[in-house]
């Protein structure tokens, strides 16, 4: 009798196993849990950039001049470049309005860019140090609205086709009158006005480097001032010597 009961028990157990769910739950001990991803520093993979835009790090720069990255947040102050640059645009900048006692402090200048939502690719300090603010493979916001030689392609659209360079400088009163009164201008230390020899040397080297790598003609038709594109602007102004910037 016990033998029949044991056989019956086995049959019932087999029946329940055969009619259960089609998927059997995996034992917890066999579940593989993916580890939390480690947060890594953001790295720009330059190999993914458009091939027609030469990554700066892949091209030797003029060794006797300093080159430092002092980048603005890419996502907020630039966008991906779709067209190769055809022009280089020259500007001047300072923090003279908000910080008249320290107008060339680079942090103050950078704060001004952020305040007004503008960005250059490069900025050149008084001692000739060149800082990269926005990589060349991205469009910086430096040109604004304007026109060039009645060409609709560039109307209010020069950012897409240019590289912007800022020089830390204060122009003539005519250049600065849109920012301050003559009385305020007269209080500025005259040694702070205009451009330095080191800036001209660094600018000349940078322009040659950019024009060579991007196949931009090294002439005044393609290296232009902000004031030439936008009548609202005055930079690089009366104190800027174009012959020194484009010295061969």
Would you name each region that the model predicts?
Residues 230-248:
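Short, low-complexity, polybasic intrinsically disordered segments
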Residues 51-81, 87-89, 94-213:
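Active-site-adjacent loop/helix surface patches within enzyme catalytic domains
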Residues 27-49:
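Post-signal peptide N-terminal segment of mature Sec-exported envelope proteins
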Residues 214-232:
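Acidic/histidine-rich, metal-coordinating catalytic segments
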Residues 20-22:
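Bacterial signal peptide processing site
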Residues 2-9:
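Sec-dependent signal peptide recognition
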Residues 15-18:
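C-terminal motif of bacterial Sec signal peptides marking the signal peptidase cleavage site
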């Amino acid at each position: 009798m016990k033998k029949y009961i044991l056989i019956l028990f086995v049959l019932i157990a087999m029946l329940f196993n055969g009619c259960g769910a089609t998927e059997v739950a995996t034992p917890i001990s066999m579940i593989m849990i993916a580890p939390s991803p480690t947060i890594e520093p953001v790295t720009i993979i330059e190999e993914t950039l458009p091939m027609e835009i030469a990554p700066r790090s892949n091209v030797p720069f003029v060794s006797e001049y300093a080159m430092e990255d002092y980048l603005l947040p890419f996502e907020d102050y630039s966008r991906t470049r779709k067209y190769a640059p055809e022009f280089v645009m020259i500007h001047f900048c300072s923090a003279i309005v908000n910080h008249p006692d320290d107008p060339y402090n680079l942090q103050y200048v950078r704060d001004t860019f952020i305040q007004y939502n503008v960005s250059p690719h490069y900025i050149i300090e008084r001692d000739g140090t060149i800082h990269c603010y926005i990589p060349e493979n991205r469009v910086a916001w430096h040109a604004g609205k304007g026109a060039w030689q009645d060409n609709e392609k560039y109307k209010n659209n020069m950012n897409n086709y240019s590289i912007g360079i800022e020089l830390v400088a204060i122009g003539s009163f005519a250049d600065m009158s849109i920012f301050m009164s003559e009385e305020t201008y007269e209080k500025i230390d005259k040694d702070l006005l205009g451009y330095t020899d080191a800036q001209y040397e660094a600018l000349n080297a940078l322009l040659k480097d950019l024009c060579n790598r991007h196949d931009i003609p090294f002439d005044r038709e393609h290296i232009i001032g902000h004031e030439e594109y936008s009548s609202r602007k005055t930079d690089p102004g009366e104190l800027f010597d174009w012959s020194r910037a484009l010295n061969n």
